């Protein structure tokens, strides 16, 4: 009888415990859980799709296969892992109110989460360092900036992140001899010490942010300096006379046939001989050829002295305007030699650089018609040279501006999304009850949202990425190679 009574009481007690466990209300109501699941699931989906688009764009579009974009590819890999695993597991943890998957999955999730997050920070740091070397050492660093070197740097970032976090997270309980994380909870055991938490926050976030901010300021200043060097003329310098022009002398003799001027031009800074300007440039195109860019240069041919010859300025297009032609003379003038002066000056109109070319014959003795055409041909070639130089300088400036803008957007997004959580970590070190649990969840999730924002940064700051995204989403695969 006593045994029956004890068994009945025991079974009733067990039944009440079971009912208590089952009937414990969750932290959120049903509609709240649906809302949380919808929002977090949508963010996870957008993160996965966006970073897959980034990786596919770099893979299929050769124009995006640059060293700098390989670092973005590595960053997209980290963001993709966060979107697939970290976001969804943390959402499950929030909705359930406890960790339902056991300690092994907990440790694996934490190891993956912290390794990938730290790899993202390391990739951002590498991007900043690599860009700083490009703008501060433009002559020496590009020679070492190879795909192999980029691969080694990316591998180092991932290996270092793995070594810093994975062993400590997975094996700390064996090092100290016990697992102190309660059942139903999931956090890193060695971070239960506030001092350790404070130190890791400084090393993993604040120190990299300070370094990247300093590097970006340095990159921005160096890029602006390089762009200004392409258009060094200031407003005060514009008022200076034409004496600031660069001059080249071309000697014209009767021994040089007309067709030679149109075949090959070899240019040299120091001087000229036999009407050929020496420089490592051959088979130049004439000024009549159509150009796809809007670079500007102008040329004029006149008998006027240099100080009286006006320079034609243009903000776009190429203008080649011989203002005056020289009449032919008797054949005895063929034996005469003439020195012509070609002047090249770069002017700045607003934010644009304009290159003007002026050819001025120094002597008053005119030449026959055959020799008369030679300055025009040379002017055309110099117009083409100047046009190409302006185009290359503008393209380089545009590329630098694009890369710098992309880096700025990525760093800004990183700082905005990661700062709230890391500020709360520091506050929690001194006051463990000051931060509400919901604010913790939001702050931690903001770190994940950074992986969602990064692909948008690439598209907004890089037109090629944007067009490639569009072609991929619309299945216009044949147009991907032409996206510019």
Curated annotation (Swiss-Prot):
<protein>
    <recommendedName>
        <fullName>Muscarinic acetylcholine receptor M4</fullName>
    </recommendedName>
</protein>
<keyword id="KW-0675">Receptor</keyword>
<dbReference type="InterPro" id="IPR000995">
    <property type="entry name" value="Musac_Ach_rcpt"/>
</dbReference>
<feature type="glycosylation site" description="N-linked (GlcNAc...) asparagine">
    <location>
        <position position="8"/>
    </location>
</feature>
<feature type="topological domain" description="Cytoplasmic">
    <location>
        <begin position="130"/>
        <end position="149"/>
    </location>
</feature>
<feature type="transmembrane region" description="Helical; Name=2">
    <location>
        <begin position="70"/>
        <end position="90"/>
    </location>
</feature>
<feature type="topological domain" description="Extracellular">
    <location>
        <begin position="428"/>
        <end position="441"/>
    </location>
</feature>
<feature type="transmembrane region" description="Helical; Name=7">
    <location>
        <begin position="442"/>
        <end position="461"/>
    </location>
</feature>
<feature type="transmembrane region" description="Helical; Name=5">
    <location>
        <begin position="195"/>
        <end position="217"/>
    </location>
</feature>
<feature type="compositionally biased region" description="Basic and acidic residues">
    <location>
        <begin position="260"/>
        <end position="270"/>
    </location>
</feature>
<dbReference type="Pfam" id="PF00001">
    <property type="entry name" value="7tm_1"/>
</dbReference>
<feature type="transmembrane region" description="Helical; Name=3">
    <location>
        <begin position="108"/>
        <end position="129"/>
    </location>
</feature>
<feature type="glycosylation site" description="N-linked (GlcNAc...) asparagine">
    <location>
        <position position="14"/>
    </location>
</feature>
<dbReference type="GO" id="GO:0030425">
    <property type="term" value="C:dendrite"/>
</dbReference>
<feature type="topological domain" description="Extracellular">
    <location>
        <begin position="173"/>
        <end position="194"/>
    </location>
</feature>
<dbReference type="GO" id="GO:0045202">
    <property type="term" value="C:synapse"/>
</dbReference>
<feature type="transmembrane region" description="Helical; Name=6">
    <location>
        <begin position="407"/>
        <end position="427"/>
    </location>
</feature>
<dbReference type="GO" id="GO:0005886">
    <property type="term" value="C:plasma membrane"/>
</dbReference>
<dbReference type="GO" id="GO:0004993">
    <property type="term" value="F:G protein-coupled serotonin receptor activity"/>
</dbReference>
<dbReference type="GO" id="GO:0007187">
    <property type="term" value="P:G protein-coupled receptor signaling pathway, coupled to cyclic nucleotide second messenger"/>
</dbReference>
<keyword id="KW-0807">Transducer</keyword>
<keyword id="KW-0597">Phosphoprotein</keyword>
<keyword id="KW-0770">Synapse</keyword>
<comment type="similarity">
    <text>Belongs to the G-protein coupled receptor 1 family. Muscarinic acetylcholine receptor subfamily. CHRM4 sub-subfamily.</text>
</comment>
<dbReference type="GO" id="GO:0016907">
    <property type="term" value="F:G protein-coupled acetylcholine receptor activity"/>
</dbReference>
<keyword id="KW-1003">Cell membrane</keyword>
<feature type="topological domain" description="Cytoplasmic">
    <location>
        <begin position="56"/>
        <end position="69"/>
    </location>
</feature>
<feature type="topological domain" description="Extracellular">
    <location>
        <begin position="1"/>
        <end position="32"/>
    </location>
</feature>
<feature type="topological domain" description="Extracellular">
    <location>
        <begin position="91"/>
        <end position="107"/>
    </location>
</feature>
<dbReference type="GO" id="GO:0040012">
    <property type="term" value="P:regulation of locomotion"/>
</dbReference>
<dbReference type="GO" id="GO:0045211">
    <property type="term" value="C:postsynaptic membrane"/>
</dbReference>
<dbReference type="InterPro" id="IPR017452">
    <property type="entry name" value="GPCR_Rhodpsn_7TM"/>
</dbReference>
<dbReference type="InterPro" id="IPR001432">
    <property type="entry name" value="Musac_Ach_M4_rcpt"/>
</dbReference>
<feature type="region of interest" description="Disordered">
    <location>
        <begin position="255"/>
        <end position="316"/>
    </location>
</feature>
<keyword id="KW-0297">G-protein coupled receptor</keyword>
<feature type="topological domain" description="Cytoplasmic">
    <location>
        <begin position="462"/>
        <end position="484"/>
    </location>
</feature>
<dbReference type="GO" id="GO:0007268">
    <property type="term" value="P:chemical synaptic transmission"/>
</dbReference>
<comment type="function">
    <text>The muscarinic acetylcholine receptor mediates various cellular responses, including inhibition of adenylate cyclase, breakdown of phosphoinositides and modulation of potassium channels through the action of G proteins. Primary transducing effect is inhibition of adenylate cyclase.</text>
</comment>
<dbReference type="InterPro" id="IPR000276">
    <property type="entry name" value="GPCR_Rhodpsn"/>
</dbReference>
<feature type="glycosylation site" description="N-linked (GlcNAc...) asparagine">
    <location>
        <position position="3"/>
    </location>
</feature>
<keyword id="KW-1133">Transmembrane helix</keyword>
<keyword id="KW-1015">Disulfide bond</keyword>
């Amino acid at each position: 009888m006593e045994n029956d009574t004890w068994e009945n009481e025991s079974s009733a007690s067990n039944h009440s415990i079971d009912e208590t466990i089952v009937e414990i209300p969750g932290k959120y109501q049903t509609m709240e859980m649906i809302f949380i699941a919808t929002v977090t699931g949508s963010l996870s989906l957008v993160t996965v799709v966006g970073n897959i688009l980034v990786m596919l764009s770099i893979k299929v579009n050769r124009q995006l296969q640059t060293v700098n974009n390989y670092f973005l590819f590595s960053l997209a890999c980290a963001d993709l892992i966060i979107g697939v695993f970290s976001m969804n597991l943390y959402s499950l943890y929030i909705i359930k109110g406890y960790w339902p998957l056991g300690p092994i999955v907990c440790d694996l999730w934490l190891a993956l989460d912290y390794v990938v997050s730290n790899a993202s920070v390391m990739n951002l740091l590498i991007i900043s360092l690599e860009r700083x070397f490009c703008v501060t050492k433009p002559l020496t660093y590009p020679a070492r900036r190879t795909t192999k070197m980029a691969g080694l740097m990316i591998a180092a970032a991932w290996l270092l992140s793995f070594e810093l976090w994975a062993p400590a997270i997975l094996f700390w309980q064996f090092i100290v001899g016990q697992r102190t994380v309660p059942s139903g909870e999931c956090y890193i055991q060695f971070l239960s010490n506030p001092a350790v938490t404070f130190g890791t926050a400084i090393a993993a976030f604040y120190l990299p942010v300070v370094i990247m901010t300093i590097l970006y300021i340095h990159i921005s200043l160096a890029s602006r300096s390089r762009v200004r060097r392409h258009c060094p003329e200031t407003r005060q310098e514009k008022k200076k006379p034409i004496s600031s022009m660069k001059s080249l002398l071309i000697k014209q003799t009767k021994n040089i046939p007309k067709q030679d001027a149109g075949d090959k031009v070899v240019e040299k800074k120091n001087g000229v001989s036999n009407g050929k300007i020496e420089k490592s440039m051959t088979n130049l195109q004439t000024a009549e050829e159509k150009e796809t860019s809007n670079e500007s240069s102008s040329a004029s041919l006149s008998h006027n002295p240099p100080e009286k010859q006006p320079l034609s300025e243009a903000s776009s297009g190429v203008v080649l305007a011989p203002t005056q032609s020289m009449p032919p003379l008797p054949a005895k003038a063929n034996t005469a030699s003439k020195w012509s002066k070609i002047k090249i000056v770069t002017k700045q109109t607003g934010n644009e650089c304009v290159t003007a070319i002026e050819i001025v014959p120094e002597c008053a003795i005119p030449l026959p018609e055959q020799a008369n055409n030679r300055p025009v041909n040379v002017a055309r070639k110099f117009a083409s040279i100047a046009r190409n130089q302006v185009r290359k300088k503008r393209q380089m400036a545009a590329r630098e501006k694009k890369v710098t803008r992309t880096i700025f957007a990525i760093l800004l997004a990183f700082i905005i999304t990661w700062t709230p959580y890391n500020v709360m970590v520091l506050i929690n070190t001194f006051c463990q009850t000051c931060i509400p649990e919901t604010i913790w969840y939001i702050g931690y999730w903001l770190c994940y949202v950074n992986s969602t924002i990064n692909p948008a940064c690439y598209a907004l700051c890089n037109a090629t990425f944007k067009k490639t995204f569009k072609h991929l989403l619309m299945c216009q695969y044949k147009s991907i190679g032409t996206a510019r």
